[in-house]
Amino acid sequence: MSRIAATFARLAGQGRKALIPYVTAGDPFADITVDLMHAMAKAGADVIELGVPFSDPMADGPVIQRASERALSRNISTADVLAMVARFRETDDTTPVVLMGYANPVERYGPDRFVDDARAAGVDGVLVVDYPPQECEAFADRLRAADLDPIFLLAPTSTDARMADVGRIATGYVYYVSLKGVTGSGNLDTDAVARMIPRIRSHVSVPVGVGFGIRDAATAVAVARVSDAVVIGSRIIQLIENEPRERVVPVAAGFIAEIRTALDTLQGTHA
């Protein structure tokens, strides 16, 4: 059983929901990411999504775009991101890490080499935003052969056919983008999310995480009531992007702990 599957199985047995924070590797300081990952895990993160910086992150709003730009300005490469995961794994061999990014860095690195090096570093899953499921079955097969979970996005505009494609090849979990548009935008319509999740579940057997638009404990709890996991990215980056170095880790950890406490008020409830 993969680390991601084991994590969701453990949480399901406890009647708890997964908390999945996202940060961009190398932001807001090049050498702070591993400390940030450890602090978030200790504060209650169940899975960590680590963004691979890219110059044209088309699905991301201005907050995550700025994070990518800051990381790239410090010359953070895909190899650097993998090295960060390897360092994290030196002292944490239980918290799953998912790399989230775009096709261009994967293609430049070389897909086969990327999979091999991701596995060696201790990565658990890979989400390539602009790899449509029907066009990347070979890559998904390669990931699974390396015991890595191919993770995919679904959106309010996703058709039943796309959901079926994702359900056929995704492992680990699927990430439902709860808003049309880019990350960090708009107001979350939790009723619309609640209506969509059963439709997704009819096509997908893995857990369903929901992200985009989750900014505080109240929205996290509302989403967690109807899903298996809450994904938070833009809000974390907003909180830390202008902090001095010594405040970045405690600010992020404090926010994660607040969300974790709120989610655990739902313990024993089922989506």
Curated annotation (Swiss-Prot):
It catalyses: (1S,2R)-1-C-(indol-3-yl)glycerol 3-phosphate + L-serine = D-glyceraldehyde 3-phosphate + L-tryptophan + H2O. Keywords: Amino-acid biosynthesis, Aromatic amino acid biosynthesis, Lyase, Tryptophan biosynthesis. It comes from the Bacteria. Its EC number is 4.2.1.20. Transmembrane segments: none annotated. Signal peptide: none annotated. Pathway: Amino-acid biosynthesis; L-tryptophan biosynthesis; L-tryptophan from chorismate: step 5/5. One of its GO terms (cellular component) is cytosol. The active site is at E49 (proton acceptor), D60 (proton acceptor). GO terms for molecular function: tryptophan synthase activity. Gene3D superfamilies: Aldolase class I. Tetramer of two alpha and two beta chains. NCBIfam families: trpA. The alpha subunit is responsible for the aldol cleavage of indoleglycerol phosphate to indole and glyceraldehyde 3-phosphate. PANTHER family: TRYPTOPHAN SYNTHASE ALPHA CHAIN, CHLOROPLASTIC, TRYPTOPHAN SYNTHASE, ALPHA CHAIN. Belongs to the TrpA family. This is Tryptophan synthase alpha chain. It comes from Leptothrix cholodnii (strain ATCC 51168 / LMG 8142 / SP-6).
